[in-house]
UniProtKB/Swiss-Prot annotation:
Protein name, UniProt field: Methionine synthase
Entry superkingdom: Archaea
Name of the gene encoding the protein in the UniProt record: metE
Keyword Membrane: no
Summary of the function given for this chain in its UniProt record: Catalyzes the transfer of a methyl group to L-homocysteine resulting in methionine formation. Can use methylcobalamin and methylcobinamide as methyl donors, but methylcobalamin is not considered to be the physiological substrate.
InterPro entries with a match to the protein in the record: Met_Synth_C/arc, MetE_arc, UROD/MetE-like_sf
Organismal lineage: Archaea, Methanobacteriati, Methanobacteriota, Methanomada group, Methanococci
C-alpha cells in the first residue's frame, strides 16, 4: 500500500548567520527554505512514498489569499483572480531535495479548496458574503490556474475541503467549484475532508475526484463509510490532534480493521492495495517535530507489516 501525508509539517527555522541577515536586508533570504528541507528530509527518512513540501509558509488559507488578487490578508477587497503560481516554487525545491535522497519518492500538489477559503475570509467588496457562489467560483477559477501550473510536476493533487463536513456549504455549489478546478485535466485528484463524514458520504461520492481522504484514528465513527465509498480511500490512521505517538501495532490494528470493512464494499474492485492510501488524519503543523516524525515512521512501519 502507498503511504502519503495530508500536507503540513512542523516549521523549523535555522539560526540566521551574518550572511543570512545581509541577504535579508536585500530581500534575498528565504527564511522558509530550511523548513522545507527539514520537512522533506523527515518525510523521506520516515519512508513515506508520496510526500509534501511541508506547507511551511503559513496556514492553509493564508498561503493562497496572500497571493491572489482581491484579498488583503483574509479580507475580500476586490474580485478574486489568479496572479502567478503560488506553490510551484516550493514544490520544485522540495522535489529536487527528495529525488536526491530517494529517486522513487513522489511529491503531491496541495491546494486549499474554494469553499474552505471562502469560509475563512471576511467579505468587504464585490461579493455579498462568504457563501456567495460567485466568490466560490472565482476562487475555483484561480485555483484551476494553480493546478495547471502544478500538473506537469506532480502525480496527484490534493484539494483540502474540511469545511464540507460542517454542512455550512451547499454540496451542489461545492461540486461545481471542484469541477471548475479538475475538469478535463489528466491527473489524479484527491479531496481531503476531515471531521465527521459518516452522514455525508453519499454527497462526497458524487465529487469528481479519484480519492476521498478522511480521518479514522481520531474519529472511528467514520469507519462505517468504508462500506459505501465509491472512490479510492485516503485512510487517516494516526491522530494528529494529540502528541502521543501511536505504536506500530496500534496503527497496524486500525488499518486492518479498515481493510476488513472495505472487503464488504461491492463498489470497489477487490484489489484493496490499489484502493487505499495510508496517511495521517490531518496536517501535522501543530505537533512537535519529533512527534510528527515518529508518527510518520510508525505509520510506514505498520503499513509494511500488513499483507492484503
Amino acid at each position: 500500500m502507498i503511504t502519503t501525508v495530508v500536507g503540513s509539517y512542523p516549521v523549523v527555522k535555522k539560526e540566521e548567520t551574518f550572511l543570512d541577515k545581509v541577504k535579508k536586508v536585500f530581500g534575498l533570504y528565504d527564511e522558509y527554505k530550511y523548513a522545507i528541507e527539514r520537512a522533506v528530509k523527515d518525510q523521506v527518512k520516515a519512508g513515506v512514498n508520496i510526500i509534501s513540501d511541508g506547507q511551511v509558509r503559513g496556514d492553509m488559507v493564508e498561503i493562497f489569499t496572500n497571493n491572489m488578487y482581491g484579498f488583503d490578508g483574509k479580507r475580500v477587497v476586490g474580485r478574486v483572480e489568479f496572479i502567478k503560481p503560488i506553490t510551484l516554487k516550493d514544490i520544485l525545491y522540495a522535489k529536487s531535495i527528495a529525488k536526491k535522497l530517494n529517486p522513487n519518492v513522489e511529491i503531491k500538489g496541495i491546494i486549499t479548496g474554494p469553499c474552505t477559503i471562502a469560509s475563512s475570509v471576511r467579505v468587504e467588496s464585490c461579493y455579498s458574503d462568504n457563501r456567495d457562489e460567485n466568490l466560490i467560483y472565482d476562487i475555483a477559477k484561480a485555483l484551476r490556474k494553480e493546478v495547471e501550473a502544478l500538473k506537469k510536476h506532480v502525480p496527484i493533487i490534493q484539494i483540502d475541503e474540511p469545511i464540507l463536513s460542517t454542512g455550512m456549504y451547499d454540496f451542489d455549489v461545492a461540486r461545481k467549484a471542484i469541477d471548475i478546478i479538475v475538469d478535463g485535466l489528466n491527473i489524479k485528484f484527491a479531496m481531503h475532508v476531515c471531521g465527521n463524514v459518516y452522514n455525508i458520504i453519499d454527497e462526497l461520492n458524487k465529487f469528481n475526484v479519484d480519492i476521498l481522504d478522511h480521518e479514522f484514528a481520531s474519529n472511528k465513527k467514520n469507519l462505517v463509510i468504508l462500506e459505501s465509498m465509491e472512490k479510492k480511500v485516503g485512510f487517516g490512521c494516526v491522530n494528529t490532534k494529540v502528541k502521543k505517538v501511536e505504536s506500530v501495532e496500534e496503527i497496524k490494528s486500525l488499518i486492518e480493521e479498515g481493510i476488513e470493512i472495505l472487503k464488504n464494499n461491492e463498489k470497489l474492485n477487490k484489489n484493496l492495495s490499489d484502493n487505499i492510501l495510508i496517511d495521517p488524519d490531518c496536517g501535522m503543523r501543530l505537533l512537535p517535530i519529533d512527534v510528527a516524525f515518529n508518527k510518520l515512521k510508525n505509520m510506514v512501519e505498520a503499513t509494511k507489516l500488513i499483507k492484503i
